[in-house]
């Protein structure tokens, strides 16, 4: 379980948002809402250990994620995946190579066929062997989402995953996220639009809103 307890973030001697607390369990999806500039990205980065909090704490399965608990930090790193505005793809590699390379540096064995299936799910199999530098922003995002789908992460933390996608890709993403949650995964995401996650002919995933309020 992920627990966020009274987290605050200060920029220029002023808090970005009021202290925020929530928890996220297996099989749940949380939608982090808030006005532009309120600090949604900053909060996600704090949760993922990419930026420090100015107050409060983040816990994973009851253990605080800080320097005094390196084992808890390592366990959290192994079980979560963050996708921000910077997709962290390598432009000199092809789409399929990006998936295989990411698995390799993470110490995971990703079969070529499984990587190709992930690209096909996101409609990228026809561009699997093209270098990222020639792809559109939407195609790069679909590649990143395909990469996400083959991680072993239980917790997905996604910052605006629905931007730069066409209607067909949005439908594929909704199914991907619904599958993850319904199979016991955890999802925390931001979006400026109303979102529904469901499988074809399946039950919609309950999405719990968390609103970030300016301090």
Residue ranges and their predicted role:
Residues 48:
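Helix-to-loop junction immediately C-terminal to a conserved catalytic motif
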Residues 56-68, 76:
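Conserved ABC transporter NBD signature motif
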Residues 86, 91-106:
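Q-loop/switch helix immediately C-terminal to the Walker
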Residues 100, 112-127:
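Conserved ABC ATPase "signature" region
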Residues 156-160:
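Catalytic Walker B motif of ABC-type/P-loop ATPase nucleotide-binding domains
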